[in-house]
Amino acid sequence: VQVLDLKTKKIIYNLPSGEDPEQFALTPDGKELYVSNEDDAIVTVVDTVNRSVVTQIEVGVEPEGMAVSPDGTVAINTTETSNFLHWIDTKTKKIIHNTLVDQRPRHIEFSKTGDKVWASSEIGGTVMVVDSTSKESIAKIKFEIPGVFKDLIQPVGIKLTSDGKYAFVGLGPANHVAVVDAKTFKVIKYLLVGQRVWMLDFAQNEKKLY
């Protein structure tokens, strides 16, 4: 994992990542980095201060998505072939729960308060909303776009507004972004965008979505 100075736009050092790194997530204090290693079916935990590997955690097949809770107590990894969310205690570095979701989970986002987790399933064509306490699904969001084949609707990227009102979901080769009411979990509208939309991000003031 390469670390860049945002002012100079230059690489300042490298961190160990394990083989075939996919997504990664920092703890809120910035001291640890959780990296999914797809080929080895592990999550690598990196000490960002000492720039060394703390441990490696065995997970399911083809780990992909990675997120850390806002309070830093839990990390979650998605495994694309096993179809699980693996909940990892960041203190013990042990898996404490596995939540089954739809096929090929690719990305996860915690709500700003940390009480919910949103997980996209690319092949399943859904987004599951999971309660962070019970670790059980509380909603499954499906997508239907007039004139677009169901197989092309492949949700991946998710961004939640900081006020907790809306979720934006990139739908891959469907070439649309879904706007979802984050309270009712209902799709409000679909925005036509360019080809194969995957990941998303807001401008700092959240007035623009990229």
State the predicted function of each range.
Residues 1-210:
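Predominantly soluble domains enriched in secretory-pathway, periplasmic, or organellar proteins
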